[in-house]
Amino acid sequence: MRRKGFYALNVQACCDRNKRFLWCYPSNNGSTYDSAAFGNARLYDLLKEMAIELQEKGLFIVGDSAYGLAPFLMVPYDKDEMKNDTGHNMDSFNYHLSSCRIYIECAFGELIMRWGIFWRTLLFDLRKCSKIIQVAMLLHNFIIDCREGRVDRGDDSYFQDFEIETDDMQDELTMATGEAPRALATDNNEPRRRGRPTIDEETQRQLGDDIRHRLTIKLAAHEMKRPLQHDMHYNKQGHIYMTS
């Protein structure tokens, strides 16, 4: 149950620059913090295991301040970190990071506006709500790919390529029979199986901070600052002009 008193799902997802959903994890309850929900996902474990390889290739995903900094996950500088940002380099990094992250915001916005079922409360149990979200994302991708001419509309194998993450140990969302829905299961509440040893959280943050610092310096070296904010005015002829 969410803090506002109704049942909901926390849906984690990744997309590309075309706003196609690449990965979806709709198996946490609505009151779960985003960082905790992402930490419950198998994708998070996989990224931790591949941290060194991803770092060598300069690859990472982008998130907002709700997530924890990691070498595979870049997040913006917070207000405390920016207190000594005299050159506005951290602010410039935040601006460009936000410019990348906006694609997922737009993807969710288009998903909601495209399918009228999301314009109101979903009057289904949480298990069915999860399936509805997954199918809507698949159709959303299909429309984008058809629009860009990247898919044969008669190809039935198209929908087999989308990664939908559910629980390994318990494939469906658990609900108590005859009772109000309880917290959604995460791998049946058992420790997740892991592969190679992974770095601890503090080391992970330090490595992430090092990568973020190097990116910040690189942006500053190329003078990629946040664009100046301009004020818009009208002259007597009604023409618009800008002042900084």
Locate the predicted segments by residue.
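Short, well-ordered secondary-structure "scaffold" segments embedded in the functional core
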Residues: 1-244
